[in-house]
């Protein structure tokens, strides 16, 4: 990642640029369980998702993050009620680094002739689902620039999930509220991630002493995480992904 201190200063002093935070969206589908006509019906979905996520400004204060987002959708089945076809999927969202979220209960309808649009008031399952994870990944990225900087994005994701639980397509939305609760409880991990990224930038710029100081803060955060929430899977994944880099900095 770029120099954290420089990026924070740029965010503070440059005018807001209304561009999306996701510079690249890599999507893969596993549609082997769908019929050939259903595969044709979702043919344009990848392009629509990419356009939706990459052109939407999810947070105006952090408009220059240039995040790469990886999405996998595994289609399991479909069902038709009236003129509406609903797809049931599993999904994986990742920033290609230490943020990864697997979801087993995805349900949405899709009309190939329409574009995707997120309405913060009127809930629709597919834009709502995509916006939820867009905000969660964004929040995790912002947390690496500012202590608890992702709070607003996490709260927006929670609001989306709450609207989902009150909709006709409530499958999985209760669990998505729990994801936000788990993240908010694990304040130690959020401290640790921020300290790691600051320490990494200091190390890359030759400040070994400052880097070691940040790594100590990181270790304290990891200890707090274990005390507060035990063996949390997000903490374990962070350590799995970053352990080699941490070891090289010591």
Kindly give the residue locations of the regions a language model identified.
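Sec-exported extracytoplasmic/periplasmic mature domains
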Residues: 50-58, 135, 139-143, 247
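Short helix-loop boundary/capping segments
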Residues: 173-202
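Bacterial Sec-dependent N-terminal signal peptides
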Residues: 1-24
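A cross-kingdom marker for long, charged
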Residues: 212-250
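Acidic/His-rich structured neighborhood in mature extracellular/periplasmic domains
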Residues: 83-181
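Start-of-domain marker
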Residues: 21-88, 98-101
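Conserved nucleotidyltransferase catalytic core and NTase-mimicking acidic/glycine-rich helix/loop elements
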Residues: 201-212, 218
């Amino acid at each position: 990642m770029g120099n954290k201190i420089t990026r924070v200063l740029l965010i503070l002093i440059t005018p807001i640029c209304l561009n999306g935070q996701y510079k690249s969206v890599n999507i893969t589908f596993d549609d082997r369980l769908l019929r050939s006509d259903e595969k044709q019906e979702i043919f344009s979905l990848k392009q629509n998702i990419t356009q939706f996520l990459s052109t939407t400004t999810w947070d105006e204060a952090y408009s220059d993050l240039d995040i790469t987002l990886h999405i996998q959708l595994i289609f399991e089945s479909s069902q038709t009620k009236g003129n509406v076809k609903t797809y049931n999927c599993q999904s994986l969202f990742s920033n290609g680094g230490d943020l990864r979220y697997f979801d087993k209960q995805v349900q949405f309808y899709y009309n190939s002739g329409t574009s995707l649009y997120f309405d913060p008031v009127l809930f629709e399952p597919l834009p709502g689902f995509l916006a939820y994870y867009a905000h969660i990944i964004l929040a995790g990225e912002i947390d690496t620039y500012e202590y608890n900087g992702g709070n607003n994005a996490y709260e927006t994701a929670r609001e989306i999930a709450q609207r989902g639980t009150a909709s006709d397509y409530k499958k999985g939305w209760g669990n998505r509220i729990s994801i936000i609760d788990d993240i908010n409880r694990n304040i130690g991990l959020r401290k640790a991630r921020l300290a790691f990224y600051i320490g990494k930038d200091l190390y890359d710029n030759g400040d070994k002493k400052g880097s070691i100081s940040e790594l100590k803060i990181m270790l304290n955060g990891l200890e707090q995480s274990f005390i507060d929430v035990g063996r949390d899977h997000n903490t374990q994944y962070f350590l799995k992904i970053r352990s080699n880099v941490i070891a090289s900095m010591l």
